[in-house]
Amino acid sequence: MDFKPMFPSLNVLWTRWSAYQIKPHQWGGEYLIPAEGATDLTYNCAEQPGPLVADALELGQQLHMGAPDKNRLCAAFAARYGLLGLNAEKGEGATEDPNVPPCYRPLNSWEYGEDVSFFQSNFVMLYQHFLTVQGELVPTPNPRVMDLSGFLSYRLTSGPNPQLVWEVRSLESVIRFAYASMISAESIPLKVCKNCGKVYYNTHAKSEFCGTKCRNYYNVKVFREKDRISHPD
């Protein structure tokens, strides 16, 4: 499957802030929220699904491996793409009450935030699913524990020429649906760099490296290893 034919003309306007921070809340937990002085930008988060999914998997990989700077990595991802909108597809209402946790404030407003543990777990689950596809992780005892699921809303217009309109309401759904279309494609465009191990997006079937630097570094490394074997001390 391909994301574009599945969701033609999909336009999901999403608001991100230029910087995020993690702060504890009086009711418990830590929340990823816009930083003081941050500015907002609204964009179509479904416009470039390839880099988006690759970056989501890369963050999931870092979190899965226990990166020491995981909070900084999450804040950087949010600054680039925005928060996930974890409750948006469920249609849960927002409130102006300043005493409630940030996740219940108006979506993507300056007061809105997401529990950092829930935020991180979404990326870890996505990456672990990718590992099962790669054959590097076998879920036991129940294979379905690694399955991914989500909400898919639509609207069918009335009249002589009805149109099917997908109503995707969150960045989380865009990531999940884009990933699903890519990972189930005949030629999977999500790859792991042969040199650095980074997950990247490339539609060329024979692509093995995330960039020229890694390709050159790997070739030099292979050349030196062959030279060492051919000319032992």
Residue ranges of predicted features:
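Short helix-coil boundary/hinge micro-motifs
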Residues: 1-201, 232
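Cysteine-rich micro-motifs
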Residues: 203-217
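Short metal-binding segments enriched for Cys and/or His
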Residues: 219-229
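Flexible domain-boundary/linker segments
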Residues: 210-213, 227, 231
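Active-site micro-motifs of SAM-dependent methyltransferase domains
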Residues: 198, 216, 221
